[in-house]
């Protein structure tokens, strides 16, 4: 019900007009919005510092980070934290039955949304197109926008794509994936 109410506000022309008259704009901070990813980076810096302060690790010790994800946003924030210097060894994507990311990592870089969609007890992970993965592909490909655009075109037209081996090697050295179903 809350989701429908929020969605209604975003599509209600009268509400949007009233906000506009007051010089306001309504925005969302979902996981494809950079405004949501930026503060998530701080979670990983803070968590690392907390482990240091508790004596769980020593400065410079690498940690593994496991993040439940469907849209690849929060785990991408962890990747950014790693790029900024947080010693993270592996970034582990935990998925539900809609395990498109797990299959991407296990297949060596083939992303295939052509599969049954499962409605699960983790609806925020019920996703077959992980839009933030596109950002990672852009970064690890050396900002190759033409390659990424071609992959996204393939995804749109055929429902799948395979990343070049050299790009996946960079990804595969840092990420892995796993999944469980609702029973597990």
Residue ranges and their predicted role:
Residues 1-2:
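Short, small-residue-biased leader/transition segments that mark boundaries at the very start
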Residues 5, 29-35, 107, 118:
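Extended interaction regions within the primary functional domain
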Residues 6, 10-17, 45-55, 82-86, ...:
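Structural signal for hydrophobic packing residues in well-ordered secondary-structure cores
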């Amino acid at each position: 019900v809350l989701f429908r109410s929020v969605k209604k506000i975003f599509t209600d022309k009268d509400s949007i007009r009233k906000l506009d008259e007051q010089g306001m704009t309504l925005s969302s901070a979902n996981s494809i919005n950079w405004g949501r990813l930026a503060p998530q980076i701080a979670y990983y810096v803070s968590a690392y510092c907390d482990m240091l302060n508790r004596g769980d690790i020593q400065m410079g010790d690498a940690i593994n980070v496991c993040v439940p994800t469907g849209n690849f946003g929060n785990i991408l924030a962890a990747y950014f934290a790693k790029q900024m210097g947080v010693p993270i060894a592996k970034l582990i994507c935990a998925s539900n039955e809609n395990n498109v990311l797990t299959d991407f990592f296990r297949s060596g870089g083939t992303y295939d949304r052509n599969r049954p969609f499962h409605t699960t007890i983790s609806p925020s992970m019920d996703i077959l197109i992980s839009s933030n993965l596109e950002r990672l592909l852009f970064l690890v490909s050396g900002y190759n926008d033409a390659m990424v655009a071609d992959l996204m075109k393939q995804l749109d037209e055929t429902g799948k794509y395979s990343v070049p081996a050299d790009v996946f090697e960079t990804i595969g050295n840092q990420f892995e994936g796993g999944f469980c179903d609702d029973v597990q």
